[in-house]
């Protein structure tokens, strides 16, 4: 059959396919390196470079098998034998519908499934062109089932692996020995899965024809050699590196303790003067001095304990963008107090949230008077956002009455600084960063005692019998120790590369599957598409994916890597390995699972195991809703384009 008259459709298909690959790169590649960027093991630029290499390689070696399912597994192409041009128009419509919806989703920073898009678009044009009989509904049922199986399976595998790692490594007093012993096993598992995937799926491309037992044996042998190399060279090097890091941290800790001792009697930077006091007045007494004197007069309390404990907790519990003159952390109370009794801290004007923060402050201007048991003893979780600074803003109206001691003056001569009662009210200032709340609000309580003032931050110095959240426990859940960070640092990079490789093999078919069908129909003049998928078309799709990643990828990386749950190198390694293993297995059997579902399932499972409050369930709900919306929306776009092409070009429906 002469196809020269439809060359314009092929050219249009190549252009749209590149746009579709661009949208896949902008949206779905965040699944691969989002957690690595979120945990801080790689920068965004490094992630883009590594993803470009492994996405392209994976698309060439693994993309052909899944592409066959996308091309011929969803609709019955034999029904288009008499109207080949209708099928070609349908492939163009499918690419348009999928590309439009993915670009919209990327603009809105919604992580959606590229597989869902192309499946929905394919069904959409088929319903217009040939009616319900053109869809292989049983195949669609299997695909829909895989959308639920993949996050559950990936989440289960990630959860089990993380529990084992936490049990044998993370919770140990000294995690280094067990971690070093497990390193060869972790590397071997990663390499074995990767080699098996390449040999099993990419063997035809490499000109190899091996039985599965031979491929498994080769994969096991390569993994064993790699494990021996890690045990012989990497483990001793890692042990020396960890020892050096711990020695440096010990020296810094000793220096920090010495600095704190020197400033124990100095003026605290939290409150340089109490509200209402004048600079020239004798009543402007440093808070730490008052606390120390009060502590000295109290039973069973040493004179130096309170100020140091209070100030130390302030340093350890707050995280923001300003530098403290004393602490070696990222935030210290380097604010200043005004006469309204509030402590103010600087928010960078270029952070992109300056106006929004001012609006929030204006909205929250009215005081919230709540019972102490509801307001106190809370530390809002910090969720680092990719596009903003995390600010620590204390809204602390201070009302304190000072009564001089009996030896200094009479009670009637004591100066009333602010009021006759002690009250504490709190404003919770929160601001949106797209889909996340980025908060780190330190709470403070100023209370008057006989002979002085005691400062307490959050719930650190309160009654231990009072039921409240333990911020220290939350902090343990969110951070790896220095040695654990080093152990899993490169492992997460390796597994991220592995995940990118698997993503390229699975998702390039979403962009190139319809183009491959269009090209083979044009070259062969029929709908059978018996020829193998051309490698250069897979490479073309890989280039489009990488372009989308570099231009727009950072928009969705934020959601997967930072907003859904806090990521550490240990949890990131678990998420990457288990989800990538699920995707590769699915790719090898030709099942077009969603990498988004696998990664989201792993992220949520590990985050829930670490802490139920660590997962942004609101964001997860939105992602879950998007899974159901994508298929019909992409199908509607595709159906509309197909109806338009059939009307303009006069194509005849194959159902007639």
Curated annotation (Swiss-Prot):
Induction: Down-regulated by high phosphate diet. Glycans are attached at residue 81. GO terms for cellular component: apical plasma membrane; brush border membrane; plasma membrane. Keywords: Cell membrane, Glycoprotein, Host-virus interaction, Ion transport, Membrane, Phosphate transport, Phosphoprotein, Receptor, Sodium, Sodium transport, Symport, Transmembrane, Transmembrane helix, Transport. Residues 27-46, 108-109, 164-190, 235-483, 553-572, 611-622 are cytoplasmic. It is found in: Cell membrane; Apical cell membrane. One of its GO terms (biological process) is phosphate ion transmembrane transport. PANTHER family: PHOSPHATE TRANSPORTER (PTHR11101), SODIUM-DEPENDENT PHOSPHATE TRANSPORTER 2 (PTHR11101:SF83). Belongs to the inorganic phosphate transporter (PiT) (TC 2.A.20) family. This is Sodium-dependent phosphate transporter 2. It comes from Rattus norvegicus (Rat). The gene is Slc20a2.
């Amino acid at each position: 059959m002469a196809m020269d008259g439809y060359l314009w459709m092929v050219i249009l298909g190549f252009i749209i396919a590149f746009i579709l690959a661009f949208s896949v790169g902008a949206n779905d590649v965040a699944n691969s390196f989002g957690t690595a960027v979120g945990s801080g093991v790689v920068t965004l630029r490094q992630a883009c470079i590594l993803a470009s290499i492994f996405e392209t390689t994976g698309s060439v070696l693994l993309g052909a098998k899944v592409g066959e399912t996308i091309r011929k597994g969803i609709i019955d192409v034999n029904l288009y034998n008499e109207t080949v041009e209708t099928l070609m128009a349908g492939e163009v419509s499918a690419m348009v519908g999928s590309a439009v919806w993915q670009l919209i989703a990327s603009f809105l920073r919604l992580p959606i499934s590229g597989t869902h898009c192309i499946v929905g678009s394919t069904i959409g044009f088929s319903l217009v062109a040939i009616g319900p009989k053109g869809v292989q509904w049983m195949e669609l049922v299997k695909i829909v089932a895989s959308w639920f199986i993949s996050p559950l399976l990936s989440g289960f595998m990630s959860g089990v692996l993380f529990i084992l790692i936490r049990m044998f490594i993370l919770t140990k007093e000294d995690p280094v020995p067990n971690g070093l012993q497990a390193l060869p096993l972790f590397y071997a598992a990663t390499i074995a899965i990767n080699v098996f995937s390449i040999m099993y799926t990419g063997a035809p491309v490499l000109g190899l024809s091996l039985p599965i037992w031979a491929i498994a044996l080769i994969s096991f042998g390569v993994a064993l050699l790699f494990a021996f190399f890690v045990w012989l060279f990497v483990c001793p090097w890692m042990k020396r590196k960890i020892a050096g890091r711990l020695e440096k941290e010990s020296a810094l800790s000793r220096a920090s303790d010495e600095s704190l001792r020197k400033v124990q009697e100095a003026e605290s930077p939290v409150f340089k003067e109490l509200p209402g006091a004048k600079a020239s007045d004798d009543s402007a007494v440093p808070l730490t001095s008052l606390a120390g004197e009060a502590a000295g007069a109290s039973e069973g309390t040493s004179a130096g304990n309170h100020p140091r404990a209070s100030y130390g907790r302030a340093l350890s519990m707050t995280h923001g963008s300003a530098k403290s003159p004393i602490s070696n952390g990222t935030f210290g109370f380097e604010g200043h107090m005004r006469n309204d009794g509030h402590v103010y801290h600087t928010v960078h004007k270029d952070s992109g949230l300056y106006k929004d923060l001012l609006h929030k402050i204006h909205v929250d201007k009215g005081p919230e008077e709540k019972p102490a048991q509801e307001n106190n003893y809370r530390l809002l979780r910090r969720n680092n956002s990719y596009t903003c600074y995390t600010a620590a803003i204390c809204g602390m109206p201070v009302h304190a009455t000072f009564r001089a001691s009996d030896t200094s003056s009479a009670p009637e001569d004591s100066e009333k600084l602010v009021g006759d009662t002690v009250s504490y009210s709190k404003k919770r200032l929160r601001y949106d960063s797209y889909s996340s709340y980025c908060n780190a609000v330190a709470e403070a309580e100023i209370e008057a005692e006989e002979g002085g003032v005691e400062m307490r931050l959050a719930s650190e110095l309160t009654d231990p019998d009072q039921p409240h959240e333990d911020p220290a426990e939350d902090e343990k859940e969110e951070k790896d120790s220095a040695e654990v960070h080093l152990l899993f640092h490169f492992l997460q990079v390796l597994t991220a590369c592995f995940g990118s490789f698997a993503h390229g093999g699975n998702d390039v078919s979403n962009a190139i599957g319809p183009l491959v069908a269009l090209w083979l129909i044009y070259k062969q003049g029929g709908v059978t598409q018996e020829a193998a998928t051309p490698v250069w078309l897979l490479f073309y799709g890989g280039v489009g994916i990488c372009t989308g990643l570099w231009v727009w990828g950072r928009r969705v990386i934020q959601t997967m890597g930072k907003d859904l749950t806090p990521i550490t190198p240990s949890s990131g390694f678990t998420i990457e390995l288990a989800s990538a293993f699920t995707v590769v297995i699915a790719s090898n059997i030709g099942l077009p699972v969603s990498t988004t579902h696998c990664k989201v399932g792993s992220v949520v499972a590990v985050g829930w195991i670490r802490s139920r409050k660590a997962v942004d369930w609101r964001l997860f709900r939105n992602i879950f809703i998007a899974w159901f919306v994508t298929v019909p929306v992409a199908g509607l776009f595709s159906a509309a384009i197909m109806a338009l092409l059939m009307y303009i070009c006069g194509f005849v429906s194959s159902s007639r």
